[in-house]
């Protein structure tokens, strides 16, 4: 998707198609890396002496070539990827997807060593900075950037509990399932579950409790209203990798948050 904000700030913006197919799954390089490359990348990245910032390990297919071209290289790490994919494999119900996530985790653990060639690692999570600094120094902690400059949560009380996230991600769907079995089925307070592409089994499970409502694929304005009007945000997770941007959103724009320490 073209980004108007980037185009306002940058001299040039190049867009590359995301590749797909079984042949990329069979490669030694992780699928999330090998499908994010293009024949035009060398021409665009190596034609000058400017530094290169790779946004996430998955974007680093050109890292080694940039290093050989004596360009300064920085990598913004979103999380410890192989741990994240391991947790996805544990949460996944579909057998093929479970195998994919497990194999991807192993490939990512091997591939991660490419970070040793970078000049700097810029970690998004304070609790993961030590991991990267010990293995691929130097690593710096730079917090997540977001649109908020002050806390602007509403006063008073809301009418429901809110659980939200990308529900197509196994980790998030599994978190709802855990909450439904241990908490939501024992209360009668209205609960709204909102997020992208909820799987059919999640809709069936939510339908067992009359006080639970699922709002699939809300647009940005609808999601913003749901966050602001909720009384309590249920922010449960089974893994501690990376940073939870939805927690930052709820803290700045919502009311009360119930969180856990994985």
Per-region residue spans from a language model:
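A short, charged, and often flexible helix/loop element on the N-terminal side
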Residues: 11-42, 93-101
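Membrane-proximal helix-turn-helix segments that form the acceptor-binding/catalytic region
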Residues: 39-46, 80-84, 92-121
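Active-site proximal beta-strand in glycosyltransferases
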Residues: 69-91
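Donor nucleotide-sugar binding/catalytic pocket of nucleotide-sugar-dependent glycosyltransferases
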Residues: 101-151
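Acidic donor-binding loop of glycosyltransferase active sites
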Residues: 227-242, 253-256
């Amino acid at each position: 998707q073209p980004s108007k904000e980037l185009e306002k700030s940058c001299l040039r913006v190049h867009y590359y198609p995301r590749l797909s197919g079984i042949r990329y799954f069979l490669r030694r390089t992780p699928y999330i890396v090998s499908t994010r490359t293009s024949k035009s990348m060398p021409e665009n990245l190596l034609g000058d002496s400017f530094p290169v910032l790779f946004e996430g390990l998955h974007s680093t297919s050109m890292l080694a070539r940039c290093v050989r071209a004596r360009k300064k290289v920085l990598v913004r790490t979103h999380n410890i990827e192989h741990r994240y994919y391991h947790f996805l494999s544990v949460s996944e119900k579909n057998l093929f997807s479970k195998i994919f996530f497990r194999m991807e985790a192993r490939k990512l653990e091997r591939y991660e060593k490419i970070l040793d060639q970078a000049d700097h690692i810029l970690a998004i999570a304070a609790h993961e900075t030590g991991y990267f600094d010990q293995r691929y120094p130097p690593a710096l902690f730079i917090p997540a950037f977001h649109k908020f400059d002050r806390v602007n949560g509403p006063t008073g009380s809301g009418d429901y509990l809110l659980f939200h996230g990308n529900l197509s991600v196994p980790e998030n769907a599994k978190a709802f399932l855990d909450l439904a079995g241990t908490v939501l089925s024992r209360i009668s307070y209205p609960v709204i579950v909102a997020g992208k592409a909820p799987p059919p089994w999640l809709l069936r499970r939510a339908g067992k409790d009359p006080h639970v409502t699922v709002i699939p694929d809300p647009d940005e304005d609808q999601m913003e209203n749901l966050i602001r009007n909720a009384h309590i945000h249920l922010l449960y997770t089974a893994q501690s990798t990376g940073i939870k941007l939805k927690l930052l959103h709820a803290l700045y724009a919502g009311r009360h948050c119930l969180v856990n320490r994985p």
